[in-house]
Swiss-Prot record:
Belongs to the site-specific recombinase resolvase family. It comes from the Viruses. Residues 66-92 form a coiled coil. It comes from Acanthamoeba polyphaga mimivirus. The lineage of its organism: Viruses, Varidnaviria, Bamfordvirae, Nucleocytoviricota, Megaviricetes. It holds the Pfam family MerR. This is Putative resolvase R771. SMART domains: Resolvase.
Length: 190
C-alpha cells in the first residue's frame, strides 16, 4: 500500500519531526519521491506496513524444548535446562517429563498450538528425539507452514546410516513396550 504524503502531513501521521523524516530518507528507512518542484513526498503507507510486519515478528517466541522420559531423570532435565539457558538466554523454556513416543505431552501440545497461531520463531532442541521419537518432520512442517519458523537441533548425530537410524527407532519402540509390559506386571503382582 503506497500512500505518499508531504512532509508536514507525514510527520503528523508518524508522530516525528520533519527533520527526522529527512534523516530517515537519507538513511533509506522510508521511501520518498520528489516532485518537479523538489518537494519530498514520503511513502507513509509502506513505512507503516513494514513496521507492522516487524512488530508481528517481535511477538513470535523463541523456545527451548527439553524433555526426559521419567521422573528418575530429573537431574538430566535440570542439566538440559541449564545448558539451554546458558546458550539461549532469551528463549522461553518449555519442558516435559514423558516418553518421546507419547505425542500427547503438555509442552509439545503448547508448541504445536503456538505454531498454529503463527507465534513460533524457532524451537531449539538438544537432539531430534527430545522433541519426538517419531513425527519430528511433521512437527517441523507445522512450525514452518503456520509460523514461518524453524527447529534448531543443537547436537546432531554424525553421518548416521538409514539402517542404523531405523534400528535405533525399532529399539526405542521395543523399549517402550517392554517398559509398559513390566509396569503392568508389577501392578498385577500386587
Amino acid at each position: 500500500m503506497s500512500k505518499y504524503m508531504g512532509g508536514k502531513e507525514a510527520s503528523s501521521v508518524l508522530g516525528v519531526h520533519q527533520r527526522t523524516l529527512y534523516q530517515w530518507d537519507k538513511k533509506g528507512w522510508i521511501k520518498t519521491i520528489r516532485t518537479k518542484g523538489g518537494k519530498r513526498l514520503y511513502d507513509v503507507g509502506s513505512y507503516l506496513a513494514d513496521k507492522d510486519e516487524e512488530s508481528k515478528e517481535d511477538h513470535k517466541l523463541s523456545i527451548c524444548y527439553v524433555r526426559v522420559s521419567s521422573n528418575n531423570q530429573k537431574d538430566d532435565l535440570e542439566r538440559q535446562i541449564k545448558f539451554m539457558k546458558k546458550k539461549y538466554p532469551n528463549h522461553t523454556i518449555i519442558k516435559d517429563i514423558s516418553s518421546g513416543i507419547n505425542m500427547n505431552r503438555k509442552g509439545l501440545n503448547k508448541i504445536i498450538d503456538l505454531a498454529i497461531e503463527g507465534r513460533v520463531k524457532e524451537v531449539v532442541v538438544a537432539y531430534k528425539d527430545r522433541l519426538a521419537r517419531f513425527g519430528f518432520s511433521l512437527i517441523e512442517r507445522l512450525i514452518e507452514k503456520y509460523s514461518d519458523g524453524k527447529i534448531v537441533v543443537v547436537r546432531k548425530k554424525e553421518n548416521q546410516e538409514p539402517q542404523e537410524e531405523l534400528m535405533e527407532d525399532m529399539m526405542d519402540v521395543m523399549n517402550v513396550f517392554i517398559a509398559r509390559r513390566n509396569g503392568l506386571k508389577k501392578y498385577s503382582n500386587k
